């Protein structure tokens, strides 16, 4: 369909944000990733043997994480745990926390929508993809 496999990028929201982190460690062809408020830590189960914090050393592509400071489902201490893991791994990654935003702050159909954070996050995502996504 005209896609360019040499410019493979991914983004995801909520559970898809978690999968975005994991996919960045899974696919060596990936160029860039942006994870929106994806859970970073958790109990290991048969269905979830690894979490993003477990794969910080294995990232194949630069990842930008976008999180809400008021997200009750993803506590800030878990975001800080991920930041420390990324720094320790010397990973090409960044995490932005929007202090006034909660979970799903980019979902304009939900009460949690936070327009200012959503717009800034979207611009950061586009810039991240432009910087790391490869040239046409």
Q: Model-derived features: where do they sit?
A:
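Gly/Ser-rich "nucleophile elbow"/oxyanion-hole loop immediately N-terminal to the catalytic nucleophile
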Residues: 1-11, 15, 132-135
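Short beta-strand immediately N-terminal to the catalytic nucleophile in serine-hydrolase-like folds
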Residues: 10-12, 36, 66
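Short glycine-enriched nucleophile-adjacent loop
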Residues: 17-28, 33
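Active-site nucleophile loop of the alpha/beta-hydrolase fold
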Residues: 34-43
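Conserved serine/cysteine hydrolase catalytic core
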Residues: 48-61
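Short beta-strand/loop motif that positions the catalytic acidic residue
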Residues: 59, 65-67, 71
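Conserved alpha/beta-hydrolase "acid-adjacent" motif
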Residues: 72-78
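C-terminal catalytic histidine-bearing segment of alpha/beta-hydrolase fold enzymes
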Residues: 87-136
């Amino acid at each position: 369909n005209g896609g360019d496999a040499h410019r493979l990028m991914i983004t995801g929201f909520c559970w898809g944000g978690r999968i975005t982190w994991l996919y960045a460690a899974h696919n060596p062809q990936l160029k860039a990733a942006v994870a929106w408020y994806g859970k970073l830590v958790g109990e290991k189960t048969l269905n979830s043997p690894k979490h993003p914090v477990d794969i910080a050393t294995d990232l194949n592509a630069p990842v930008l994480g976008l999180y809400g400071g008021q997200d009750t489902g993803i506590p800030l201490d878990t975001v800080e745990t991920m930041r420390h893991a990324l720094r320790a791994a010397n990973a090409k990654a960044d995490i932005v926390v929007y202090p006034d935003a909660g979970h799903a702050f980019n979902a304009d159909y939900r009460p949690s929508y936070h327009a200012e954070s959503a717009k800034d996050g979207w611009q950061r995502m586009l810039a991240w993809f432009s910087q790391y996504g490869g040239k046409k």
